[in-house]
Amino acid sequence: MLIGKVVGYVVSTRKCDNLVGNKFMIVEPIPSLKIDNRIVAVDKVGAGIGEMVLVAQGSSARIGCGNPQAPIDAAIVGIIDEGQNLE
């Protein structure tokens, strides 16, 4: 799991049927965690731009979304209210 900040969103008008109704957000990992690539993650918790989030990846992302058959690589599974050394 990684910690990141929501920096934008992606609109997809055509997608797999089991992804319809999901919101896609762009997440930037926290620089202090040494991860420098932005990712697109399915948002199941209603995160907003600027919020710090928890992102599950791989099969954990699919299970976290409640759809183990969906073609999902990353999912926002939590919003961080507070934490130490996050920025």
Residue ranges and their predicted role:
Residues 37-41:
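Short alpha-helix capping/helix-loop boundary micro-motifs
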Residues 54-87:
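C-terminal structural segments of small proteins and small subunits
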Residues 14-16, 42-44, 64-67:
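A generic local secondary-structure boundary/capping motif
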Residues 1-32:
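N-terminal first-folded block
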Residues 30, 42-44, 58, 80:
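A structural micro-motif recognizing beta-strand termini
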